[in-house]
């Protein structure tokens, strides 16, 4: 009876693990679409300056002047960038991977990687698997010259080639970029911030990030950070 119970318990446990894995893949296939959480467009003001003295980074505020996101980089071109919320909690971690020194690829993870628990190998691999991969377009490849980067979803099926989930077109250098989904619909946009007075100019250090309904603002800001690493 004991052996039979253990066998049944193991089967149920493995089934739950498989179910959780399928659920995680389904969530990854949807991310960063967050239907029902953002019903109107959100406009954020992005300041290319850290709140910490002697740091490179970003400060992001909403239309009411409230701090939403912050980034503090202690080196100019880091291989890891952490997006934090207003209280300093990590939202997303981005890590750089280079292939042959040509392709600039960044993998996006939920939360802060360094502080994750190590309870089991299964949970560890699930937490440490990236959500998305953002790759800079290589200019020598044929295609749309307006494209700056591609966003790919990452799944457990590493052998299957996937089309980009999102395409980033425009010019980050001039702060005129759009993030387009597979149907070429704009889900986020980087725009220059217009001043009320003609005598005032914000330049490229202060700009706007407009996030359309249904798209994750945190991931939209992560794209801004990666474009800055790729093109600044």
Residue ranges of model-derived segments:
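Low-complexity or membrane-interfacial segments used for flexible interactions
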Residues: 1-69, 73-79, 86, 103, ...
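Polyanion/phosphate-binding surface patch
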Residues: 69, 91-93
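An anionic oxygen-ligand recognition environment, strongly enriched in 2H phosphoesterase
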Residues: 107
């Amino acid at each position: 009876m004991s052996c039979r119970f253990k066998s049944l318990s193991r089967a149920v446990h493995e089934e739950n693990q498989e179910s959780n894995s399928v659920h995680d893949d389904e969530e990854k296939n949807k991310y960063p679409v967050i239907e029902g959480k953002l019903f109107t467009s959100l406009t954020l003001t992005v300041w290319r300056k850290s709140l910490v003295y002697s740091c490179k980074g970003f400060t992001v505020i909403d239309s009411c002047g409230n701090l939403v996101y912050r980034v503090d980089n202690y080196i100019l071109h880091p291989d890891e960038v952490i997006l934090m919320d207003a209280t300093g909690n990590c939202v997303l971690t981005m890590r750089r991977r280079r292939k042959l020194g040509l392709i600039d690829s960044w993998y996006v993870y939920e939360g802060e990687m360094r502080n994750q628990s190590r309870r089991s190998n299964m949970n560890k691999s699930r937490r440490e698997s990236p959500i998305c991969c953002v790759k800079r377009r290589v200019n020598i490849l044929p295609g749309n010259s307006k494209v700056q980067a591609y966003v790919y979803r990452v799944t457990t099926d590493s052998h299957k080639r996937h089309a980009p989930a999102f395409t980033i077109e425009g010019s980050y250098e001039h702060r005129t970029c759009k993030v387009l989904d597979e149907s070429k619909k704009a889900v986020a946009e980087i725009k220059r911030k217009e001043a009320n007075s003609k005598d005032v100019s914000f330049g490229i250090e202060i700009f706007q990030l407009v996030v359309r309904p249904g798209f994750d603002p945190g991931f939209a800001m992560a794209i801004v950070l990666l474009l800055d690493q790729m093109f600044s």
